Amino acid sequence: NYEYSLGLNGLGACATQYSSEFMDVEVFRDGYKYDLHFEKGRNVGGLKKEETKQKKTGTKTHWRPDLEVFTDIKIENEYFEDVLKKQAVVNPNITFILRIQRENNSFEEKTFYYENGIADYVAEIAGEKPLTSVQFFTGDRKGRDREDKDDYKVKLSVAFTFSNQVKCLEYYHNSSFLEHGGSPEDAVKSAFTSQINAYLKSNNKYLKNEKPITFQDIEDCLVLVSSSFSTQTSYANQTKKAITNKFIKECMTEFLKHNLEIYFIENPDEAVKIA
């Protein structure tokens, strides 16, 4: 189901096929198993299809980079660990396993799993002594970026806590890490600044002539991870490190402001700590 997807990955699959010494693809769907084998980018043996009693679905791709194409390959293991960990964070209750083959043909294995996704990840980052409890907000919205555009669906999830020992802000969209944020980052900055400022004003926390707080004051003790999904996405560029959807920014800002207002009312002791 590609309703909420980073893309169809057609170009990536094609590029991998043509830059591999070999590539094997195994697909299970609709009661059948399909196999394709490629060597140096060309299919060998055609498509093989057979019935199967297994009910599982999915695709397995196994390939080896072609050393005639990649004359110098040196990718640190930490890169693969980081990629799989991020995928585990935004895909709760799914196990990701990294197996690294050593020179003696033995394997080193690492498992990445977050039962509650971003909420567990925030708790992990904050450590044993966060300033406040981990909060998790989730919701669905539907709207459009412009009047002449079609409506699209948005899923929003945000987990956060406050800490006087660590800070972290991470944004994900359609399971992809947004290194440069974009719309979700703008929404978080606007909503947290607005609601904390409103709390300080309504509870007379400001000193006379004291300037209103800025997000820079807040982020130094904020641990927050957001994971959003949408059926239509506008990326800042082809690297897909930031999204620019106007509606996502607007609906996420409203979503956060509403939930933060309730959080401050229902948790007065934590609100005082934050202030």
Predicted regions and their residues:
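GHKL-family ATPase ATP-binding module
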Residues: Y4-L6, G10, C14-Q17, F22-A275
